[in-house]
Amino acid sequence: IDDKTHGYRAEENGENIGECIFSLGGIYAEILSVKTRGGDRLVAEGLVRSALNFAANRSAYMARADVGRVEKEPFVTLGFEEKNGFYESDIPSALTGSCGHCVK
């Protein structure tokens, strides 16, 4: 989108079924929006994972998303914690997998 804002789109049979917009700044990545057709949790998780991987490959270590701008899922599934109005996590922990994160 520009040099600090990026996005991923998920398509199925040529139809847009989801998108994730995120920005990078130093060691931080901020997920600005995640939208999916019908609130598909798996597509949302895949898009966020893609964004986090992209960010990590560009030296980002921490990620966050504004609680007021995104749905709770997939952030809780990926192990993000809610702090001061944001879902926050270090990227390596979020990318370790959703197994076990959703049950604490």
PLM regions with names:
Residues G68-G85:
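Conserved active-site alpha-helix within GNAT-family acetyltransferase domains
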Residues E12, S33-V34, V67:
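Residue-level recognition of conserved beta-strand positions in structured domain cores
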Residues A55-G68:
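Conserved GNAT acetyl-CoA-binding A-motif
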Residues E81-C99:
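Conserved catalytic-core motifs of GNAT/GCN5-like acyltransferases
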Residues G25-G39, S89:
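Conserved acetyl-CoA binding element of GNAT-fold acetyltransferases
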Residues G39-A56:
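Conserved acetyl-CoA-binding loop-helix of GNAT-fold acetyltransferases
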Residues K4-G18:
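Conserved beta-hairpin
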